[in-house]
Amino acid sequence: EAGEAVGEPAWPMPLPDEIRTLMDSEVADVLQMAANMDRAGHMLQGGLFLREFVADGVPWAHIDIAGPSYHSGEATGYWVKGGTGVPVRTLLHLLEQS
């Protein structure tokens, strides 16, 4: 809702168990990156990795900014060419509403 209000729409992504099992390790608690996965799943892997360090019942969010953090096209709306600042507006709105 905060993202929608400031023009930075977002949605919750899944944390698939089938990807988490690819992050199992014989020498570490968890691998940072899943074995045998391409870049397409990195955002999901990041969320799964972070979840390992959050206690049950504690609300948390993985805000992945790799995709929208840089706009290489022409300026449009408040999007300038270059660094976008996504999700700064969303986080500020969320803080202002709390």
Roles of regions detected by a PLM:
Residues E1-S98:
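A generic structural signal for tightly packed, nonpolar segments enriched in small/aliphatic residues
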